[in-house]
UniProtKB/Swiss-Prot annotation:
Gene Ontology cellular component list: chloroplast; chloroplast envelope; chloroplast outer membrane; chloroplast thylakoid; chloroplast thylakoid membrane; cytosol
Signal sequence extent: none
Leftover remarks: The presence of TOC33 is required for the import of PORA into plastids in cotyledons and true leaves.
Family: Belongs to the short-chain dehydrogenases/reductases (SDR) family. POR subfamily.
Protein name: Protochlorophyllide reductase B, chloroplastic
Coiled coil: none
UniProt cross-references to InterPro entries, sorted A to Z: NAD(P)-bd_dom_sf, Prochl_reduct, SDR_fam
One BP annotation, GO: response to ethylene
Protein's cellular compartments: Plastid, Chloroplast outer membrane; Plastid, Chloroplast thylakoid membrane
Tissues/organs with expression: Expressed in flowers, upper leaves, rosette and cauline leaves, stem. Not detectable in non-photosynthetic tissues such as roots and seeds. Expressed in seedlings and adult plant.
Pfam family, one: adh_short
Protein EC: 1.3.1.33
Source species: Arabidopsis thaliana (Mouse-ear cress)
């Protein structure tokens, strides 16, 4: 996301990343529509109970066949001229109501090859955002998802499955950032909010939807977790204090509740900027652990990326006015690292669909206008043993173990 090089201006400037967790809108067929019509017709039936039963059964079977035809389609279909064509892919993008998530949703929708499920916390905001950028109505669906609530994550998965729509790609993009906070804020389950939203919510979502990805007949199934340069301490931006450091994970193991454990993963004093950076390290460790555990078995491509510094994103909207005024030109003319939301969205869309980016376990990056390349992660962000521990502790915290 966009936090990336913000720290280059000054460690005194802190960056706010708002949870872009929203939900999605139209492209699924609602079986309740069929159910309503069945009820109306059955009520109007006259005659013997046997006749009513037969007619009701016939209508039910018709509705089931109609729903199946509407929500499931083979990977390859035949066009009017008889040529084989690939069906549209279905991609879930979290935090798709603004910033990188919205730009990605738009880039994918405009290809005409994807149905985008915009998984967002604010349903109306997501609907307005999709319309404002001109996304075709039949290219997206808004569904509610609040990653700060594990119950909401489970409800989203349940609602998605009720649509009987295949899942081909999951993009874990949404995040929150509280750089100026003096005290921690907590999620519904009592976890520090940055880690709860950015890591634990996505961890549960990805674990649950992995079963859906496995079932997909799409040629290239992918699970993508957006990383950040600020959590990668082998970069200049990653070395600006406070640096990411998970320590021995004592805070994570204690539940990040600020009561019988620290609200910070490493067990230290609360720091909003560091909490965000630590959560992004967890994201990158999680991607690699998914790769090690499931790539060979499932064929799913697991990847992370840093799309560049989106200096003009709404991520910084709650920062001090001076920072908001100076940061974009600083990135454009001094560091040359500035990337527009549109360009960053195209980059993430590339990781979603480009046939040349199917390598699993990779952290993708770009240099200015250069093509994508495999970037190196820091020692901590690529620590195999720490990734295993983060995975196992996270399983317990979200109720999977």
């Amino acid at each position: 996301m966009a936090l990336q090089a913000a720290s280059l201006v000054s460690s005194a400037f802190s960056v706010r990343k708002d949870a872009k967790l929203n939900a999605s809108s139209s492209s699924f067929k609602d079986s309740s529509l069929f159910g309503a019509s069945i009820t109306d017709q059955i009520k109007s039936e006259h005659g013997s109970s046997s006749l009513r039963f037969k007619r009701e059964q016939s209508l039910r079977n018709l509705a089931i066949r109609a729903q199946t035809a509407a929500t499931s389609s083979p990977t390859v279909t035949k066009s009017v001229d008889g040529k084989k064509t690939l069906r549209k892919g279905n991609v879930v993008v979290t935090g798709a109501s603004s910033g990188l998530g919205l730009a990605t949703a738009k880039a994918l929708a405009e290809t005409g090859k994807w149905n985008v499920i915009m998984a967002c916390r604010d349903f109306l905001k997501a609907e307005r955002a999709a319309k404002s950028v001109g996304m075709p109505k039949d290219s997206y669906t808004v569904m509610h998802l609040d990653l700060a609530s594990l119950d909401s994550v489970r409800q989203f998965v349940d609602n998605f499955r009720r649509t009987e729509t295949p899942l081909d790609v999951l993009v874990c993009n949404a995040a929150v950032y509280f750089p100026t906070a003096k005290e921690p804020t907590y999620s519904a389950e009592g976890f520090e909010l940055s880690v709860a939203t950015n890591h634990l919510g996505h961890f549960l979502l990805a674990r649950l939807l992995l079963d859906d990805l496995k079932k997909s007949d799409y040629p290239s199934k992918r699970l993508i977790i957006v990383g950040s340069i600020t959590g990668n301490t082998n970069t200049l931006a990653g070395n600006v204090p406070p640096k990411a450091n998970l320590g021995d994970l004592r805070g994570l193991a204690g539940g990040l509740n600020g009561l019988n454990s620290s609200a910070m993963i490493d067990g230290g004093d609360f720091d909003g900027a560091k909490a965000y950076k630590d959560s992004k390290v967890c994201n990158m460790l999680t991607m690699q652990e998914f790769h090690r555990r499931f790539h060979e078995e499932t064929g799913v491509t697991f990847a992370s990326l840093y799309p560049g510094c989106i200096a003009s994103t709404g991520l910084f909207r709650e920062h001090i006015p001076l920072f908001r005024a100076l940061f974009p030109p600083f990135q454009k003319y001094i560091t040359k690292g500035y990337v527009s939301e549109t360009e960053s969205g195209k980059r993430l869309a590339q990781v979603v669909s480009d046939p040349s980016l199917t390598k699993s376990g990779v952290y993708w990056s770009w240099n200015n206008a250069s093509a994508s390349f495999e970037n190196q992660l820091s020692e901590e962000a690529s620590d195999v043993e720490k990734a295993r521990k983060v995975w196992e502790i996270s399983e317990k915290l979200v109720g999977l173990a």
